[in-house]
Amino acid sequence: MYTTQDIAAIRTQVRQWKRAGETVAFVPTMGNLHQGHITLVTEALKRADHVVVSIFVNPMQFGQNEDLDAYPRTLAADQAALEAAGAELLFTPTPAIIYPKGMDKQTFVEVPGLSEELCGASRPGHFRGVATIVCKLFNIVQPDVALFGKKDFQQLMVIKAMVEDLSLPIEIVGVDTIRESSGLAMSSRNGYLSEAQKQQAAQLKRTLDEMAEAIAKGQAIPNVVRHAQEQLHQAGFKPDYLSVRNAADLREAQDSDKQLVILAAAFMGSTRLIDNLSFERA
């Protein structure tokens, strides 16, 4: 696997592959990789001839008082895991390479509506940062297909909307969430949790499962949400939001909607965890 910070080197290699009629898949990450990321690479290998991965802790998507400086940087371990998984090209730019004029003078991409609620309401500017860096990386790598985890469901929807709105010739693939044996969704931020907190945090997925079952049986969504919030409080969480949405467009769920998704964000101690569950209502 070849690792570079150089935009020109990435473009040269991708151009060579495409001239040979070969396809390119892309997996953007912030590093500190876990099995969920490796699964994205494995899936990417099924969909293209070559896999490019990026590692960039994007300062534009972190708000004030968030964990930018504390976010783990584990490049050597990440490189070893990616090489073992079959990635061929790793792009590891610095903020100065990505934002040479500084973030305040950087052209940005913003997806209206989707970016402003749920995680967007709790983290203003977050999805502007996500959309901007993903669009920029797409322009650098020029992939045929890009893969993202469904754990970040709202992010996946924002990226799909951006690609559609800007007519980018890239297929966006969502990959199912990879979980610990307890049910806790794998996340780089799980490393902030103590072992006891990890066991407590598994209640988040159990709560989502119980909500989906109750809604599928016809219970009123507001009542289900209220009960679930009480459950999370009792389990030691401080809920940020808990919302049932149409899975296709993230509108508030209507009685006629069949394909639904429950989205949740909650703090366990000082660590903010997110999860979601898609299900069908009869």
From Swiss-Prot:
Pathway(s) it belongs to: Cofactor biosynthesis; (R)-pantothenate biosynthesis; (R)-pantothenate from (R)-pantoate and beta-alanine: step 1/1
A cellular component annotation (GO) from this entry: cytosol
Entry EC no(s): 6.3.2.1
One example of a Gene Ontology biological process annotation: pantothenate biosynthetic process
Protein's UniProt name: Pantothenate synthetase
Note: The reaction proceeds by a bi uni uni bi ping pong mechanism.
Sites where the protein binds beta-alanine: 61
NCBIfam families for this protein: cyt_tran_rel, panC
Subcellular location: Cytoplasm
Record has Nucleotide-binding as a keyword: yes
Gene symbol of the encoding locus: panC
Any Pfam family: Pantoate_ligase
SUBUNIT field: Homodimer.
MF (Gene Ontology): ATP binding; pantoate-beta-alanine ligase activity
UniProt function note: Catalyzes the condensation of pantoate with beta-alanine in an ATP-dependent reaction via a pantoyl-adenylate intermediate.
Residues holding ATP: 30-37, 149-152, 178, 186-189
Similarity comment text for this entry: Belongs to the pantothenate synthetase family.
Active-site residues, as the UniProt record annotates them: 37
Catalytic activity: (R)-pantoate + beta-alanine + ATP = (R)-pantothenate + AMP + diphosphate + H(+)
Keyword annotations of the record: ATP-binding, Cytoplasm, Ligase, Nucleotide-binding, Pantothenate biosynthesis
Annotated coiled-coil segments of the chain: none
Annotated (R)-pantoate binding sites: 61, 155
Gene3D superfamilies per UniProt: HUPs, Pantoate-beta-alanine ligase, C-terminal domain
